[in-house]
Curated annotation (Swiss-Prot):
Coiled coil: none
HAMAP family cross-referenced by the UniProt entry: UPF0178 (MF_00489)
InterPro entries hit by this protein: UPF0178
Name the record gives this protein: UPF0178 protein Rru_A0086
One Pfam family of this chain: DUF188
Domain of life, source organism: Bacteria
Length: 150
């Protein structure tokens, strides 16, 4: 089991590092620019990808496997990871599953269309402290589920 972080604009990297360290997991921090990572942990691996669209997503989708965990706010990337047998967790603690990913993709597309039509403005709610707590719980639950073989 390894953890893959879609690092660009990820507000829970530090929390993910701490949980992964406690479980002695390898963490791949993938982005198109350097982000801070713990220098004293050899299990944390920084991956810098080109600045082309979806380069980080493509790298993660190519390298992730069954039993791994992806941390991302990108719903299409979460869907790609699920197809490979990995777990996917949003940065607000929402666990994406085979049962929920279709609805999440549909809502994403609907909101994009409504924004383009001017029917709604803005994006998702700001990241809140409760999101951090939900994320920590979701990551721990995902790790335990993989360890139990689910």
């Amino acid at each position: 089991m390894e953890v893959f972080i879609d690092a660009d604009a990820c507000p829970v990297r530090t929390e993910a590092f701490k949980v992964a360290e406690r479980h002695r997991l390898i963490v791949h921090v993938v982005g198109n620019a350097p982000v801070p990572v713990p220098h004293n942990d050899p299990r944390v691996r920084r991956v810098i990808v080109p600045t082309t669209p979806d380069a980080a997503d493509d790298w993660i989708a190519e390298h992730i496997g069954e039993g791994d965990i992806c941390i991302t706010a990108d719903i299409p990337l979460a869907a790609r990871c699920l197809k490979k047998g990995a777990k996917a967790i949003g940065t607000t603690g929402k666990a994406f599953t085979e049962d929920s990913i279709g609805m999440a993709l549909s809502m994403r597309d609907l909101m994009r269309d409504l924004r383009e039509a001017g029917a709604v403005s803005g994006g998702p709610a700001s990241f809140a402290p409760k999101d951090r707590s939900r994320f920590l719980q979701a990551l721990e639950e995902a790790i335990q589920a993989v360890k139990r073989g689910r």
